[in-house]
């Protein structure tokens, strides 16, 4: 970014808070910007919404869901990072302005009736790129 941060390195470093906490505390945390409590709390609200949507998607499309990352931070290992942890690392690198826009997008989707599940929307576009018309069609094609 414009102040010299390597955002990709920082994102993966932030994920280490869960996957390798001792290394994170010693070798990463002192060198990356600390998030305010308010920002961290707002991020956790966004993360909770997205994890709920991913869980809902997996329940409705279990075969497609099998190909996804582990869902929650409690499932992290040193070699496997969950969707929740990955998202936390990603959002932690966003500027305040970018995060505010992302937060608003998630809020708009959550407030819609019915809600617009971003996991479902993303996976629908993905399976359409693979030649399927619908998620149901893609789910049925899985073995």
Give the predicted meaning of each segment.
Residues 1-12, 46-47, 91-107:
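Short, structured motif recognition centered on aromatic/hydrophobic residues
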Residues 13-16, 25, 29-32, 36, ...:
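Residue-level detector of alpha-helical secondary structure
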Residues 35, 40-58, 143:
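N-terminal hydrophobic signal/anchor transmembrane helix of membrane proteins
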Residues 49, 123-124:
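EF-hand and EF-hand-like helix-loop-helix modules
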Residues 54-69:
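Terminal low-complexity "docking" segments
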Residues 68-90:
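Eukaryotic low-complexity, mixed-charge intrinsically disordered interaction/regulatory segments enriched
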Residues 111, 115-121, 138:
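Short, surface-exposed polybasic-aromatic patches that bind anionic ligands, especially phosphate groups
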Residues 125-132, 137-142:
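Solvent-exposed beta-strand motifs enriched in subsets of small alpha/beta binding domains
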């Amino acid at each position: 970014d414009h102040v010299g941060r390597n955002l990709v390195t920082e994102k993966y470093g932030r994920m280490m808070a869960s996957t390798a906490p001792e290394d994170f505390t010693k070798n990463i945390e002192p060198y990356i910007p600390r998030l305010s409590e308010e920002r961290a709390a707002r991020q956790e609200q966004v993360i909770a919404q997205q994890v709920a949507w991913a869980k809902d998607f997996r329940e409705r499309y279990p075969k497609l869901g099998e190909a996804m990352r582990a869902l929650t931070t409690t499932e992290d290992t040193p070699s496997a990072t969950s969707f929740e942890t990955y998202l936390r690392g990603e959002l932690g690198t966003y500027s305040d302005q970018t995060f505010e826009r992302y937060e608003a997008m998630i809020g708009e989707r959550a407030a819609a009736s019915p809600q617009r599940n971003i996991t479902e929307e993303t996976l629908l576009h993905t399976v359409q790129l693979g030649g399927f018309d619908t998620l149901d069609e893609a789910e049925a094609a899985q073995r």
